[in-house]
Amino acid sequence: MAYINKKFRLPQFTLGVEEEFQVIDPKTRELRSHMHQIVEGGKVILKEQVKAEMHQSVVEVGTNICKDVSEARKEVTYLRQMVAKLAHKQGLVIAAAGTHPFSRWQDQLITDHPRYEEIIREMQDAARSNLIFGLHVHIGIDDREIGIRLMN
């Protein structure tokens, strides 16, 4: 068990969660490069909480900055429900997994955005083939020194 100095105070923290979902054809189960319809449909309701990613078969959602885990859980649940509904309206489904089991990365369209174009130009197939889907938890800590100690 790690020793914690009695002078060590618990830091105040915030958190945010981002999830990247696969956009899937419900009949073939292949990835579909139709993220734009989901993102555009979601902008009215979810505003900046729904985003495009480099591959058009990926849709990303992200919580606001949350004050605790309970608030983050509620937002994540809501975002999952909303992105599933948005996909359903387009005749698609979403899935959460690290990668797709059989869709070819070569078949995936790249989102038209200067940042992604630069990444593809510099990294080429290493970037194109990086067809992964993640869940990211971002933690904000009010004291940098304590943050470094926690990371160590």
Regions found by a protein language model. Give the residues of each.
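Histidine/acidic-residue-rich, glycine-tolerant segments that coordinate divalent metal ions
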Residues: 140
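Helical (often loop-to-helix) elements that flank the catalytic cores of nucleotide-handling enzymes
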Residues: 113, 119-120, 143-152
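An acidic/histidine-cluster motif and surrounding catalytic segment
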Residues: 137
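Terminal catalytic/cofactor-binding subdomain
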Residues: 1-126, 131-133
